[in-house]
Amino acid sequence: MAMSSITSAKQLNAEELLDECDSFNGEFVPGTIPFRANGAAIGYVTPLVLEILIKADNFKFNWVYVPGEYIEINASTFEKRTDILAKVLEHWRHNNTFGIADQWRNELYTVYGKSKKPVLAVERGGFWLFGFLSTGVHCTMYIPATKEHPLRIWVPRRSPTKQTWPNYLDNSVAGGIAHGDSVIGTMIKEFSEEANLDVSSMNLIPCGTVSYIKMEKRHWIQPELQYVFDLPVDDLVIPRINDGEVAGFSLLPLNQVLHELELKSFKPNCALVLLDFLIRHGIITPQHPQYLQTLERIHRPLPVPVGKYERGDSFEDTSKKAETCVPAKPQKATHQLAPCKAWLRDYDTDQKFAVLLLNQPIDIPDDRFRTLWKRASIRVCADGGANQLRNYDSSLKPDYVVGDFDSLTDETKAYYKEMGVNIVFDPCQNTTDFMKCHKIIKEHGIDTIFVLCGMGGRVDHAIGNLNHLFWAASISEKNEVFLLTELNVSTLLQPGINHVDCHDNIGLHCGLLPVGQSVYVKKTSGLEWNIEDRICQFGGLVSSCNVVTKATVTIEVNNFIVWTMETRL
């Protein structure tokens, strides 16, 4: 690639770069009116959008419209405002009005009111139609200059399949702040998803914000605010493609970055963030002819309220004002787990579960095993698991013996056949005995399975058992599989908020194991060493040898993660 025709940052035409992103000159299209909430403008609606909006179902009931002055949703709560606007956008999506079906993300952005509290949440694919403020995070990851090398910046190229700005250069790591997420949490999550890097809040350097206002071709304005971070690294830190949004990463020296800026190779708002970086690092200095103008335009006053982001994921409802609290993100599922309840006294007799014996010695406490066996709705032996049961107590009768029978002895097979047990031969070599048994159990309408499987001995068997947790989850989100060993129970936590009943496990060891993938842990509670805004992954942070301190442990994650804990004798 040819070198830049400019020899220093002083020659960079910042104004041209800014015009691509900060293109609003302060004059609204005639007929544009404020979109209000509680008497304050939170956005702006152009005549083109207004013409379609007033045709919405129940418009006169759901909206307050004063022609030439303002429009406002006729609702006093966050939830009702969000619901009214969601129905409008869903209708427009169905008809691809304004092309929003092509930009639909199934992700919400938060819109803030004059009190800096959320007043509604809106689909990311349509927020721009109402002139709402969007917020995001941008981080420049760079290797500082040395005697041998100039300053170098990690620059990704956007995937050719991206909905917006495909194949353009981007900031090192960036992303929009979804409804309910925090600034730092979003930044850490984006590092994990886009660059496959474990970054903590201790490493990131907050560098303020940039703000700008874009005038779209159809004349609606798009105000944006980006929280800016720096991350200086050494040569050993290398970002890697992870989520498909990035085609590749390049480590570019400063002169190459200037060259790409000159060519307008960067997505426009990323170029603006880089201008901010160059100013903060003294690369663009007051001697640059557009220095003051650049400073002003990357910190534009915004015509709409800017929200106050809390540390956590929710806001307390402290009054009965119209601007109510933010509920949990609608797409964030909540899961309740009680791994030990099936053998305790407070067992719910309506809870149906299966017991599955794999080909490992039965090493859990005898009273626990017999309680589970008695309470189970169905009892299944996987191949050689029948040998183990017969050796343990030949009087116990399983409902099924299932497998390809490469481990089942002829004597055991004949013994249980004589007892009237269902013997199911499945020769398929592409499925494990666990999978074969799981199919039988699901045919009985049972989702919860307690699997007796030794995790000692062969490592490949232990890893295979953990793989069954992920396999079962891939079949159905209703599946609950608990692996039982001598004094331990392990299961798979799903993305979202998981509440684990640990009232019989307080003081015992536990762990969170990110098997096969990195997992962003938003927050935990009820542990001796809680985690917040961290990436867990092998080769990095793994929360092993933790301790249960409360009757309920809560774990919020963005991906599947193995939960394991000791059980009491």
From Swiss-Prot:
<keyword id="KW-0963">Cytoplasm</keyword>
<dbReference type="Pfam" id="PF04263">
    <property type="entry name" value="TPK_catalytic"/>
</dbReference>
<dbReference type="GO" id="GO:0005737">
    <property type="term" value="C:cytoplasm"/>
</dbReference>
<dbReference type="InterPro" id="IPR036371">
    <property type="entry name" value="TPK_B1-bd_sf"/>
</dbReference>
<dbReference type="GO" id="GO:0006772">
    <property type="term" value="P:thiamine metabolic process"/>
</dbReference>
<keyword id="KW-0808">Transferase</keyword>
<dbReference type="GO" id="GO:0005829">
    <property type="term" value="C:cytosol"/>
</dbReference>
<dbReference type="GO" id="GO:0009229">
    <property type="term" value="P:thiamine diphosphate biosynthetic process"/>
</dbReference>
<keyword id="KW-0067">ATP-binding</keyword>
<dbReference type="Pfam" id="PF15916">
    <property type="entry name" value="DUF4743"/>
</dbReference>
<dbReference type="InterPro" id="IPR015797">
    <property type="entry name" value="NUDIX_hydrolase-like_dom_sf"/>
</dbReference>
<protein>
    <recommendedName>
        <fullName>Thiamine pyrophosphokinase</fullName>
        <ecNumber>2.7.6.2</ecNumber>
    </recommendedName>
</protein>
<dbReference type="InterPro" id="IPR007371">
    <property type="entry name" value="TPK_catalytic"/>
</dbReference>
<dbReference type="GO" id="GO:0036172">
    <property type="term" value="P:thiamine salvage"/>
</dbReference>
<keyword id="KW-0786">Thiamine pyrophosphate</keyword>
<dbReference type="InterPro" id="IPR036759">
    <property type="entry name" value="TPK_catalytic_sf"/>
</dbReference>
<dbReference type="InterPro" id="IPR000086">
    <property type="entry name" value="NUDIX_hydrolase_dom"/>
</dbReference>
<feature type="domain" description="Nudix hydrolase">
    <location>
        <begin position="136"/>
        <end position="276"/>
    </location>
</feature>
<dbReference type="GO" id="GO:0016301">
    <property type="term" value="F:kinase activity"/>
</dbReference>
<dbReference type="Pfam" id="PF00293">
    <property type="entry name" value="NUDIX"/>
</dbReference>
<dbReference type="GO" id="GO:0030975">
    <property type="term" value="F:thiamine binding"/>
</dbReference>
<dbReference type="InterPro" id="IPR031804">
    <property type="entry name" value="DUF4743"/>
</dbReference>
<dbReference type="GO" id="GO:0009228">
    <property type="term" value="P:thiamine biosynthetic process"/>
</dbReference>
<dbReference type="Pfam" id="PF04265">
    <property type="entry name" value="TPK_B1_binding"/>
</dbReference>
<keyword id="KW-0547">Nucleotide-binding</keyword>
<dbReference type="InterPro" id="IPR006282">
    <property type="entry name" value="Thi_PPkinase"/>
</dbReference>
<comment type="function">
    <text>Involved in the regulation of thiamine metabolism, phosphate metabolism, mating and cell growth.</text>
</comment>
<dbReference type="GO" id="GO:0044715">
    <property type="term" value="F:8-oxo-dGDP phosphatase activity"/>
</dbReference>
<dbReference type="GO" id="GO:0005524">
    <property type="term" value="F:ATP binding"/>
</dbReference>
<dbReference type="InterPro" id="IPR007373">
    <property type="entry name" value="Thiamin_PyroPKinase_B1-bd"/>
</dbReference>
<dbReference type="GO" id="GO:0004788">
    <property type="term" value="F:thiamine diphosphokinase activity"/>
</dbReference>
<keyword id="KW-0418">Kinase</keyword>
